[in-house]
């Protein structure tokens, strides 16, 4: 199973995250897991300290998720995920799995909600990035040709501004005001 297939649908993205998380036993992962899920799990375990340092730079992420404020998570975590190459995409999925494990230890929300929320954000961001690359004529992430980082910083900045405009239009009004 390649990475593009694993992120193609919400269900497959959710299954991949579930197989990589700590809530899946070793035996279940070994019997029913895919090589990709084992790879993502291995990356998650190897880079655990780096992921922890990243989370230390974003204080209040889990507290805001507990209160139902998702803007902090979407702006500080999801927008910084990188799918420009297969290795970076695996690292992004590993980081999402790490977030799921950390959120599990600190919450009163149901495990299904947590899994759905992180899977949905990962899947939506991957789709947005894929559509953006397709509209710009950039190669897609796939087994034949890894996506090389192309385009200037100006294009990336323009894309972020477009995403911010879309996010502002879609806000439900539940998020607290942000400090600039």
Swiss-Prot record:
Listed SUPFAM superfamilies: Bcl-2 inhibitors of programmed cell death (SSF56854)
InterPro entries membership: Adenovir_t-Ag_E1B_19kDa, Bcl-2-like_sf, Bcl2-like
Chain positions covered by the region annotation Disordered: 142-180
Basic and acidic residues composition-biased segments: 157-172
Pfam families reported for this sequence: Adeno_E1B_19K
GO process annotations (BP): regulation of apoptotic process; symbiont-mediated suppression of host apoptosis
Keywords from the named record: Early protein, Host-virus interaction, Inhibition of host apoptosis by viral BCL2-like protein, Modulation of host cell apoptosis by virus
Homology family: Belongs to the adenoviridae E1B 19 kDa protein family.
Protein's name in the database: E1B protein, small T-antigen
Species name: Simian adenovirus serotype 7 (SAdV-7)
Source taxonomy: Viruses, Varidnaviria, Bamfordvirae, Preplasmiviricota, Tectiliviricetes
